[in-house]
Regions:
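Extracytoplasmic Gram-positive cell-surface binding/anchoring modules and repeats
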Residues: 162
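Extracellular beta-solenoid/beta-roll
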Residues: 1-90, 94, 100, 105-159
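Outer membrane beta-barrel translocator domains of Type V secretion systems
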Residues: 165-178
Length: 178
């Protein structure tokens, strides 16, 4: 894909039957549905074409080639509405992830809001947050899951801890010295 390819719509998602879909550097894949085979991303995969909850499914492997994924998420707890990338095979390479806040006032997460799910191996995959996400008193950070969830990526909330200001140092007066 060198231009823009839009898959289906919210009422009628489309699954591309191709074995290999390549999103070139200037290309963009968006819409509703997925790719039956492998997806290589050097461009943009945009899931933000509707309200949060869009799922792009890759039936094969996903390879990030410094491409970008655009997602929308309601910033709340673990069960917040979000766009998701679901990879049935393996994931590898480096991909940047930009998340647009689509409502929500922030809340504590336990496991996090799952935004990327990989069924296969993801040892050689990097999904990197592009910018800060804040809601209320919370910052959201894109992190790889742990244990049995280590092939998935989550938006984890943490309290926005204010940076303490240095204490004022009292002036030193000679008459205080003994």
């Amino acid at each position: 894909i060198q231009g823009t390819l839009i898959l289906g719509n919210a009422d009628s998602p489309v699954m591309l039957g191709s074995n290999q879909v390549i999103v070139e550097e200037q290309g963009k894949l968006s819409g509703f549905g997925g790719v039956a085979g492998n997806l290589s991303n050097s461009g943009i995969v945009d899931l933000t074409t509707y309200m949060p909850g869009n799922i792009l499914t890759v039936g094969g492997n996903y390879t990030g080639r410094n491409g970008l994924i655009l997602l929308q998420t309601e910033t709340g707890g673990d069960n917040s509405k979000t766009d998701r990338l679901v990879i049935k095979g393996n994931a590898s390479g480096r991909t940047r992830v930009a998340v647009t806040q689509a409502g929500g006032t922030g809340a504590e997460t336990l496991n996090g809001i799952e935004v990327i799910h990989v069924s296969g191996n993801a040892d050689n995959a990097e999904f990197i947050q592009t910018e800060r996400i804040t809601a209320g008193a919370y910052d959201y950070i894109l992190k790889r899951g742990q244990g049995i969830n280590s092939t998935n990526w989550y938006l984890i909330s943490r309290k926005d801890i204010p940076v303490p200001q240095p204490e004022a140092v009292p002036e030193n007066h000679d008459n205080n010295l003994r």
